[in-house]
């Protein structure tokens, strides 16, 4: 049996370009959990899902808010990703937060990634071609230059299998995550689930953790035990 490899995938792009719908189509998990997010149809906080690509590769997916008001949350989620997909809606092409998110990911040293052209069911071939060319010009000189631009529709499912395969190949090209060293996880969110207790989410920067491990929460110094 092949050894499992785990990576963190960040989903970036302009507001309402279909990041959350795409993640839901890929994973079956709707990452908008807040009532306000569902009512407004936009992501406000970081969302999380898991994607099993097969071949021993699993991705922890971070859905990063695309609205300009929530760029702080986006930066928080982008800090520990191994690879990213930049989502561009075919019916709108490149928009301000498309550019901003790309610049943030590039400045953070993100190495792996692909571009996803969403909502292709809403445009004709000519419009799709223009949006694709504008996106290709945008990523020149960044970590996404020369990376695949995958056209998909979360609504019809078109292109999702191609996207999964592209993500798998991109992940396999990356070095395995280092699990040595102290476990460090900057906490993005804390909430309580009935029957489970306190749940924290974030992006692991180093080390590994398992059920029963004891950790120290900083800066308070509180000692906690990990439960699955």
Task: Tell where the protein language model's regions lie, with residue ranges.
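Conserved G1/Walker A P-loop phosphate-binding module
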Residues: 1-64
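Conserved Switch II/interswitch segment of TRAFAC-class P-loop GTPases
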Residues: 57-59, 64-69, 79-130
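Amphipathic alpha-helical transducer elements in NTP-driven molecular machines
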Residues: 4-5, 44-45, 68-71, 78, ...
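Signal for well-folded cores of large energy- and translation-related assemblies
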Residues: 27, 31, 35, 39, ...
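Solvent-exposed alpha-helical segments within well-ordered globular domains of core cellular machineries
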Residues: 24, 72, 76, 86, ...
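Conserved catalytic-core segments of large NTP-driven translation/proteostasis enzymes
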Residues: 137-228
């Amino acid at each position: 049996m092949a050894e499992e490899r785990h990576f963190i995938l960040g989903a970036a792009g302009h507001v309402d370009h279909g990041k959350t719908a795409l993640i839901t189509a890929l994973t079956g998990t709707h990452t908008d959990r807040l009532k306000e997010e569902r009512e407004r149809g936009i992501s406000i906080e970081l969302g999380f899902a898991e994607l099993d690509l097969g071949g021993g590769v699993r991705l922890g997916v971070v859905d990063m808010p695309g609205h300009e008001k929530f760029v702080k949350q986006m930066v928080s989620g982008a800090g520990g990703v191994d690879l990213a997909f930049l989502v561009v809606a075919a019916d709108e092409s490149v928009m301000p937060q498309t550019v901003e998110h790309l610049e943030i990911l590039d400045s953070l040293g993100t190495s792996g990634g692909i571009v996803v052209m969403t909502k292709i069911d809403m445009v004709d071939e000519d419009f799709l071609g223009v949006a694709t060319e504008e996106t290709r010009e945008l990523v020149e000189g960044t970590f996404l230059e020369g990376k695949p631009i995958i056209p998909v529709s979360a609504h019809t499912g078109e292109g999702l299998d191609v996207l999964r395969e592209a993500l798998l190949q991109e992940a396999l090209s990356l070095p395995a995550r280092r699990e040595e060293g102290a476990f460090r996880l900057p906490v993005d969110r804390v909430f309580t689930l009935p029957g489970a207790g306190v749940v924290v989410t974030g992006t692991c920067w180093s080390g590994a953790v398992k059920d029963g491990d004891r950790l120290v929460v900083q800066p308070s110094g509180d000692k906690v035990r990990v439960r699955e």
